[in-house]
Amino acid sequence: MSRIGNKPITVPDGVEVKLDDRHLTVKGPKGTLERDIHKNMTVSIEGNVITVTRPNDEAENRSLHGLTRTLISNMIEGVVNEYKRELQIVGVGYRAQKQGNKLVMNLGYSHPVEMETPKGITFDVPNANTIIVKGIDKELVGQTAAVIRTKRPPEVYHGKGIKYAEEHIRRKEGKAGKK
């Protein structure tokens, strides 16, 4: 059984954590994040240590305990160091470019696919085949990267499409053909 919820969270210097009833605000050098804490969880801040406690050992509360602790930890990590996800575009003629606050991708469709930059996210396009999604909110960075990937998911026969940089695509063999 995991005991992640019991581990205290240390708040680094330069990060300000404020708790108003059930609303947690984390302010750091990269920005500010806010989140509402579940009604069953109790968050206490003593000095530069945050602890999360649960009322009892019911299954729901055990699940929420670790989740709440990890969400708070991710908020603190995000305002100190940005989160980033790297996507790679594989395919002949597939490319991405940044135009103002839009990401424009040519993905083999009859039209370019345009995507507005969500609030709190920045796109970097170091070359035509790489997109880097950056932001302080881990959840939003992951969600945005997943939305970009769904525009043209990698296909298993040729490996063409948008994939995460660390993702490995299991390739399939084409059909054998007649003899």
PLM feature spans:
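N-terminal intrinsically disordered, cationic/polar leader segments
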Residues: 2-146, 150-179
